[in-house]
């Protein structure tokens, strides 16, 4: 039988919440007897928006806003059925986007 792998990709704007969520997932998977690889920090995505400060003229006066998206990757190698059940029941904070691939 081939090795089964679950790949979990986490995204959030707040890196503290993201790290707490990753720690919860790693702790849960280790407790159920699965092998873990990660959390691996992926490059932070920066989106910059430039807007005019004035509504009418003065084009030289602009303001920039930045939005950062932090990402982490966790691989669970050889997960047990108990691992999958405990990950489904795991309560993670809002603001964290989770993608799971089998």
UniProtKB/Swiss-Prot annotation:
Tell me which SMART domains the record gives: Ribosomal_S10
GO BP term, pick one: translation
Q: Which Pfam families does its entry note?
A: Ribosomal_S10 (PF00338)
Would you say which domain of life the source belongs to? Bacteria
Q: What InterPro entries does this protein map onto?
A: Ribosomal_uS10 (IPR001848), Ribosomal_uS10_CS (IPR018268), Ribosomal_uS10_dom (IPR027486), Ribosomal_uS10_dom_sf (IPR036838)
A single cellular component GO annotation = ribonucleoprotein complex
Q: Which GO terms describe its molecular function?
A: structural constituent of ribosome; tRNA binding
- Function description: Involved in the binding of tRNA to the ribosomes.
What the entry lists under NCBIfam families is as follows: PRK00596.1, rpsJ_bact
PANTHER family registered for this protein in UniProt: 30S RIBOSOMAL PROTEIN S10 FAMILY MEMBER
Descriptive protein name? Small ribosomal subunit protein uS10
Classification lineage: Bacteria, Bacillati, Bacillota, Bacilli, Lactobacillales
Q: Which gene encodes it?
A: rpsJ
